[in-house]
Amino acid sequence: PEFVGFERLYIPELDLITMTSYEADYPVKVVFPEVEITNPLAEVLSQEGCRQFHAAETEKYAHVTYFFNGGREDMFPGEERHLEPSPKVATYDLQPEMSARPLTEAVLARLRDHDDDFILVNYANPDMVGHTGVLAAGIRAVETVDECAGRLVAAIDAKGGVAIVTADHGNCERMIDEKTGEPHTYHTTQPVALFVIGDQYYDLR
């Protein structure tokens, strides 16, 4: 009502529809209402008395906390976290290694000193460097994560654990637009791999 930027016309019977809910008191229809996430894995592990450790660099803070915990910011009982500061650079192609190596060292130390039932690690590099569209930096980012994830998998295997390596979406596997030849800077919709690495055979359901 207090808007004075320009004269507005009243349009009768205007049906406003949004893709998602922005504010509960907006008088609009929502195509995809927010779905309450129940029994996220972190909560199930907590209810079973499991110890869990979530780790990422700060650029992906929300992915191992709020998102993974089903839209809950607080930790569940038995959960601990480690956040490694992301580098202060204008764009991550300037430092494609980001903080993967110190993050890895922190998780390796955790593996040595604790007996957690579940460890969650997020590597930001393939996504964040992929968004820059700089091919050479994307290659370096993937090489760094390959090295770091390899060290973690080896340590988990040595401890008799099972490692699951996957992603929530693609990005840096396509750094060049095939049609235009221009840099490709956004997420892809291609299937992602899921590797289960351990000494036993696992029948996934």
Where do the PLM segments sit?
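Feature captures the catalytic ectodomains and active-site-proximal regions of enzymes
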Residues: 1-205
